């Protein structure tokens, strides 16, 4: 199956995405650990007959399939499945066209026009029509990608591009974060871009403004001409025609129409026109008729020189003292002397220095008329440097070139290469003002990036990895190689600082580059798609064709969240270079801006590593860390937390603990002395951020571990090890004066385990955990003896003693807990102990788990006794929530598919109600995380609130198992889960107002009763976790809302020009599957 998945991807599958790709088709990840391999790449290297591994140009590891005829048919089916999963284009299709179905086992046809679930407002229809198709939009596939120049306006076009992939918060695969209001406004600006105007309409409008007899107000021609005279007199050194409209508007607060601008060169009584040919295109300079017009060579070329400056065409002429001729010098002789001067200065001679140098060399003054550069075009070329003051460099022409100018017949004797190099380029469309469009930040939740280099945490150069980014760039570079190697027009004859060119790098690769300096025959270029600079020979620089301006520069900068205060710290920079540079990482984008604020994650190992948090920990003062050794003993130890697997967190007396108390007192004084303002509170929470939380009258350091919404999140107390759910509004930023002091103190919670007890046995029994918590958490003074320090797992093996039992090992907690019959209890403690007993035994710390450790557990088959209803609270009695209103047959609704088993069973949620469900779940999280647990007498088919993966859901209990687990059905999402009975709490009436959101559904239009696993995978990949449109065929009502069932057509309307009817796709799949091989 692995080979088939790889064969369906002709361009290979990145190693970082292979697991997800494999799971999307099979439903399971590659079980490489079960086969004895520690990493996926190690397993792939062991099967060279199936997988071929290569490293791409950008350093990404790509996996390719080794061809096998046996899997060709499976690969074809996978490829067919993939073909209908193309990403959408730059626009969103808000209207679904009526499409007649094929007569193959269909029962009915859709009869309504449907709409795409809430992406764009109605004005999107107006925006879409004049928008040209984007060559770099997401609708293009990699194989058919073209790089044609798209005319402006570019910013509006790219404002629309991200709309298609921006799904709601509920559809994010990981780290579901509800955006704060200030960030939500920014997203709304992407979803509601400013409507674009038709450039043709603007042009027509400008024409009407100057056409006589039109209905528009007619401009006074004499006023415009007088204004132009004033401008040209002010700019006696000349004025670019292309700059005239802007200057005119700034001076006279009026627009100079495009048609009027075309007429300006023909007004010979007002201005004179000088045409210049630079870089193969023609520019015009205007001069007042009252000022003598300077002349420049029409074929301006560039020569390498040691005084390289930006080559900007000039507007001004030098003011030089009047020179008198030294007699009647023949013209040819004068040119020969000037040629000798220029030949002596092989790197060029400044124009204003020519008279002085000529006089020093020949003891004669240079005639004034010679300063007209038109008369020197046959012996020198001119490099125009700046406008004000006038600067130009003169270069001597070769003898062959001078002869060529004087005698065209000599061309036959000149080598063809020389003629090609020095032949003037034909005028063409100017490219010096062309700029690529801005880089659009990917809309996916966690895009991949390659970290190129960094000089500060606020200036980290990255490149996005993906089809529309690195893959598109590789395709463009292949085209650049063909263009620069074969096209004769690609040769460049004029260089300037800041110019975009194509530069030849190693391995015969051509890259886009920007010139940053010119020194002799060497050019320093910055590769704009990679973010680093290099010095190359001038012969390796080529003209950048306009087709290569369509792709945005791929190298961009970002800021690392949480490291702003230490952006230039050498320790942070060194750690970041070691952990991130040259690696492909996942990125979580917190703020989308010109320089995004991000969190980097290394996902190459078994666990995701937060690079930002890992670098921040490098600031810890090692001198404050505990130096633990085997057989060392400590007294006055405080046990701060007991976890459900028997892990303990302890605080030992140390210099670090003393400094922590002292610094936290300063924090308290700082907050009391200042007025409470908004900047003291955490405004942008993210995983790995360290902040302060006020707990039991004292400030404590906490690290954010999970963000549930804009109001609720999970934190871990750094100095006690406790995990809790808190409100965002309860967190405060560390005061800047004390930030480094608090960060430098190592966490004071020492992670320990009891020696001589089995490790990695899973969760302890609830009775054992509760006994341990009751014994050690209430003891003010404990003692420990260190047995072993495991640095690999950051675990300390200890013997734990209460205050009166040290150092007798037989009376240690380790011995007492094994002597107790705590491991025999398999029934959940809440179902067998009275509420008063539980309340008296409850302590602080993390929740105890529900599972029994295998190996210590002996009674696996004991039955659960019926709970005593008098000993625990029962479910409150109140009315059911109102039933969810469903459309009638023939009507449609926008839905989100939360669960998809097969076409005969999937679960939908009403799209328009999702935001209400998010609010309810957020309130449930805050309510149950801040209230004390209650013992609950669980009953089958009753409603409760249950905690599943750090979130609370409204559930229906389906069964109670003998090992303390409860089978529940999520009434809003349609999933079945197993949870600990201690994670089930009464569902209060406050959370019963919203109708249950899960709609059990069946696909209409298909007749198959039994679906194969392969067909189920195809169906799941096309509908699960996606916003779709449902056309209801039948509603089967029932007494209970969770037993209602809908039969509906499902349609994917996300593509710009195609609607995917899921029942048609499944029917076609069955036909393909039933064909003979």
UniProtKB/Swiss-Prot annotation:
Q: Where is the HTH OST-type domain?
A: 1-67, 220-289, 330-398
User: Basic and acidic residues bias located where?
Assistant: 857-868
What Pfam families does UniProt report for this protein, alphabetically? OST-HTH, TUDOR
Q: Does the keyword Repeat apply?
A: yes
**According to the UniProt entry, which residue ranges have a biased composition of type Polar residues?**
300-328
Chain segments annotated as coiled-coil in the UniProt record: none
Q: Where is the Tudor domain?
A: 494-551, 684-741
Compartment annotation: Cytoplasm
Q: Which GO terms describe its cellular component?
A: cytoplasm; ribonucleoprotein granule
Disulfide cross-links: none
Enumerate the InterPro entries for this protein: LOTUS-like (IPR041966), OST-HTH/LOTUS_dom (IPR025605), SNase_OB-fold_sf (IPR035437), TDRD7_LOTUS_3 (IPR037978), Tudor (IPR002999), Tudor_domain_containing (IPR050621), Tudor_TDRD7_rpt2 (IPR047448), Tudor_TDRD7_rpt3 (IPR047449)
Coarse class of the primary localization is cytoplasm
Q: Which GO terms describe its molecular function?
A: mRNA binding
Q: Name one GO biological process term.
A: lens fiber cell differentiation
Superkingdom, according to UniProt?
Eukaryota
Q: Which UniProt keywords apply?
A: Cytoplasm, Differentiation, Repeat, RNA-binding, Spermatogenesis
Task: Please give the residue ranges the record annotates as the region Disordered.
Answer: 300-331, 841-883
Task: Give the family this protein belongs to, as stated in its UniProt record.
Answer: Belongs to the TDRD7 family.
Described function: Component of specific cytoplasmic RNA granules involved in post-transcriptional regulation of specific genes: probably acts by binding to specific mRNAs and regulating their translation. Probably required during spermatogenesis.
| Name assigned to this protein | Tudor domain-containing protein 7
Question: What is the protein's species of origin?
Answer: Xenopus tropicalis
Q: Which gene encodes it?
A: tdrd7
């Amino acid at each position: 199956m692995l080979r088939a998945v790889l064969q369906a991807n002709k361009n290979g599958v990145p190693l970082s995405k292979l697991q997800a790709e494999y799971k999307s088709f099979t439903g399971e990840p590659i079980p490489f650990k079960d086969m004895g391999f520690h990493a996926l790449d190690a397993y792939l290297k062991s099967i060279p007959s199936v997988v071929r591994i290569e490293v791409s140009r950008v350093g990404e590891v790509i996996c390719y399939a080794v061809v096998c005829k046996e899997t060709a048919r499976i690969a074809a089916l996978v490829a067919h499945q993939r073909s209908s999963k193309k990403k959408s284009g730059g626009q969103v299709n808000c209207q679904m066209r009526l499409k007649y179905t094929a007569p193959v086992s269909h029962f009915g046809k859709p009869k309504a026009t449907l709409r795409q679930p809430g992406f764009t407002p109605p004005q999107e229809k107006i925006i879409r029509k004049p928008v040209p198709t984007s060559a770099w939009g997401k609708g293009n596939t990699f194989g058919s990608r073209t790089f044609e120049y798209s005319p402006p306006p570019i910013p509006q076009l790219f404002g629309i591009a991200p709309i298609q992939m921006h799904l709601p918060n509920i559809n994010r695969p990981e780290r579901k974060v509800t955006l704060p209001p200030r960030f939500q406004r920014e997203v709304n600006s992407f979803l509601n871009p400013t409507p674009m105007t038709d450039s043709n309409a603007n042009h027509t409008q400008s024409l009407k403004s100057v056409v006589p007899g039109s209905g528009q107000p007619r401009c006074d021609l004499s006023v415009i001409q007088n204004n132009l005279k004033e401008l040209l007199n002010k700019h006696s050194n000349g004025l670019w025609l292309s700059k005239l409209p802007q200057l005119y508007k700034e001076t006279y607060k009026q627009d100079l129409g495009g048609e009027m601008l075309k007429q300006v060169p023909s007004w010979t009584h007002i201005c004179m026109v000088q045409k210049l040919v630079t870089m193969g295109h023609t520019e015009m300079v205007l001069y007042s008729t009252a000022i003598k017009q300077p002349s420049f060579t029409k074929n301006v070329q560039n020569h390498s020189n040691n005084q390289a400056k930006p080559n900007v065409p000039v507007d001004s002429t030098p003011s030089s003292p009047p020179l008198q001729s030294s007699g009647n010098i023949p013209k040819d002789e004068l040119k020969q002397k000037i040629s000798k001067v220029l030949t002596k200065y092989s790197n060029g001679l400044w124009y204003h220095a020519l008279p002085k140098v000529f006089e020093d060399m020949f003891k004669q003054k240079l005639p004034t008329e010679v300063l007209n550069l038109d008369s020197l075009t046959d012996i020198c070329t001119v490099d125009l440097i700046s406008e004000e003051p006038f600067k130009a460099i003169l270069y001597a022409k070769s003898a062959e070139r001078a002869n060529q100018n004087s005698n065209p017949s000599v061309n036959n004797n000149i080598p063809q290469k020389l003629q090609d190099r020095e032949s003037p380029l034909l005028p063409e469309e100017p490219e010096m003002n062309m700029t690529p469009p801005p880089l659009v930040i990917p809309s996916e939740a966690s895009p991949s990036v390659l970290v190129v280099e960094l000089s500060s945490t606020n200036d980290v150069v990255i490149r996005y990895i993906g089809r529309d980014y690195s893959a598109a760039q590789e395709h463009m570079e292949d085209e650049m190689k063909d263009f620069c190697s074969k096209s004769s027009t690609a040769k460049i004859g004029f260089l300037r600082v800041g110019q975009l060119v194509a530069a030849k790098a190693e391995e015969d690769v051509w890259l886009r580059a920007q010139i940053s300096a010119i020194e002799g025959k060497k050019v320093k270029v910055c590769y704009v798609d990679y973010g680093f600079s290099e010095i190359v020979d001038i012969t390796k620089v080529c003209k950048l064709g306009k087709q290569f301006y369509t792709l945005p520069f791929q190298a961009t900068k970002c800021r690392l969240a949480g490291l702003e205060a230490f952006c230039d710290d050498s320790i942070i920079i060194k750690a970041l270079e070691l952990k991130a540079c040259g690696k492909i990482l996942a990125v979580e984008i917190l703020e989308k801006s010109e320089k995004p604020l991000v969190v980097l994650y290394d996902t190459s190992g078994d666990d995701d590593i937060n690079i930002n948090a890992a670098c921040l920990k490098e600031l810890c003062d090692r001198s404050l860390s505990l130096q633990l050794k085997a057989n060392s003993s400590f007294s006055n130890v405080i046990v701060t937390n007991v976890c459900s697997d028997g892990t303990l967190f302890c605080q030992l007396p140390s210099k670090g603990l003393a400094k922590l108390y002292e610094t936290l007192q300063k924090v308290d004084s700082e907050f009391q002395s200042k007025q409470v303002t908004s900047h003291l509170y955490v405004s942008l929470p993210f995983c790995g951020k360290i902040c302060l939380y006020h707990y039991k009258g004292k400030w404590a350091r906490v690290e954010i571990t999970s963000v549930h919404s804009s109001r609720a999140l999970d934190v871990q107390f750094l100095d006690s090890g406790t995990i809790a759910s808190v409100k965002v509004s309860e967190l405060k930023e560390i005061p800047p004066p004390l930030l480094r002091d608090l960060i430098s103190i190592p966490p004071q919670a020492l992670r320990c385990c009891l020696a001589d007890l089995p490790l990695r046995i899973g969760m302890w029994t609830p009775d054992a955990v509760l006994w341990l918590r009751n014994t050690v958490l209430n003891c003010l003074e404990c003692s420990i003896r260190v047995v072993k320090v495991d640095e690999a797992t950051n675990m300390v093996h200890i013997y734990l003693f209460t205050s009166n039992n040290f150092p007798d090992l037989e009376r240690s907690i380790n011995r007492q807990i094994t002597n107790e019959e705590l491991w025999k209890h398999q029934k959940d403690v809440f179902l067998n102990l009275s509420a008063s007993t539980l309340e008296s035994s409850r302590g602080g710390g993390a929740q105890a788990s529900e599972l029994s450790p295998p190996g210590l557990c002996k009674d696996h088959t004991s039955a659960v006794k019926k709970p005593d209803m008098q000993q625990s609270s029962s479910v409150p009695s109140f009315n059911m929530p109102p039933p969810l209103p469903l459309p009638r047959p023939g009507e449609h609704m926008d839905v989100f598919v939360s669960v998809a088993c097969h076409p005969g069973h999937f679960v939908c949620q009403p799209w328009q109600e999702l935001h209400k469900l998010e609010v309810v779940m957020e309130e449930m999280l805050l309510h149950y995380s801040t209230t004390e647990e209650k013992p609950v007498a669980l009953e089958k088919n009753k409603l409760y609130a249950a905690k599943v993966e750090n979130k609370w859901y409204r559930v229906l209990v389906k069964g109670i198992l003998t090992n303390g687990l409860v089978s529940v059905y999520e009434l809003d999402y349609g999933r079945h889960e197993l949870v600990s009975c201690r994670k089930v709490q009464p569902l209060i009436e406050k959370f019963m107002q919203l109708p249950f959101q899960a709609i059990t559904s069946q696909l209409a239009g298909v007749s198959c009763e039994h679906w194969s696993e392969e067909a189920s995978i195809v169906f799941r990949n096309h509908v699960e976790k996606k916003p779709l449109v449902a056309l209801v065929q039948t509603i089967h009502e029932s007494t209970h809302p969770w037993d209602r069932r809908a039969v509906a057509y499902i349609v994917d309307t996300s593509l710009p020009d195609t609607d995917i009817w899921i029942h048609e796709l499944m029917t076609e799949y069955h036909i393909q599957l039933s064909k003979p091989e």
